[in-house]
């Protein structure tokens, strides 16, 4: 999404200000291993542009934990980045090995217990940001479709 794309969307009066931007990880090293074509700075630029054009917009995402090679430091970086986003909701899931994929053959496969613990921590964090987002909706008036 470019700034022009976002400005064009903002001119549409019937557009619901809810945006799902798949993140996958809040750590650039992990995103590189995943072969994603963006980094956290670009992601944050899009988030800031959306918030500048859409007051009180709802941002949602997908976050994967436990991707092969993810260190404790990388997980903490991802957790911190996700917390900084103030998301309305996040779908958190642990990496699961799928035969035939590039990631399945990567070194650094993490034990299930580590992936489960990281998933639980990320879910706790995103539940807090969701609660804060929802609390901010109290008393607001919004147009809805039925």
PLM region spans:
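Terminal RNA-binding accessory module
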Residues: 105-146
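Conserved non-cysteine loop/helix-boundary elements of the Radical SAM core domain that shape
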Residues: 1-88, 95-114
């Amino acid at each position: 999404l470019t700034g022009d794309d976002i400005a064009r969307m903002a001119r549409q009066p019937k557009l619901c200000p809810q945006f799902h931007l798949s993140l996958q990880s809040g750590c650039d090293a992990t995103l590189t291993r995943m072969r994603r074509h963006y980094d956290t700075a670009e992601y944050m630029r899009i988030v800031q542009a959306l918030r500048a054009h859409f007051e009180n917009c709802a941002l949602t995402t997908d976050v994967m934990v436990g991707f092969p090679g993810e260190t404790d430091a990388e997980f903490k970086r991802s957790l911190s980045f996700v917390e900084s986003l103030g998301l309305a909701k996040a779908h958190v899931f642990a990496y699961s090995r799928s035969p035939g994929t590039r990631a399945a053959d990567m070194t650094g496969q993490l034990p299930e217990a580590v992936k489960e613990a990281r998933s639980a921590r990320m879910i706790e964090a995103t539940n807090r940001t969701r609660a804060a987002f929802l609390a901010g909706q109290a008393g607001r008036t919004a147009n809805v479709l039925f």
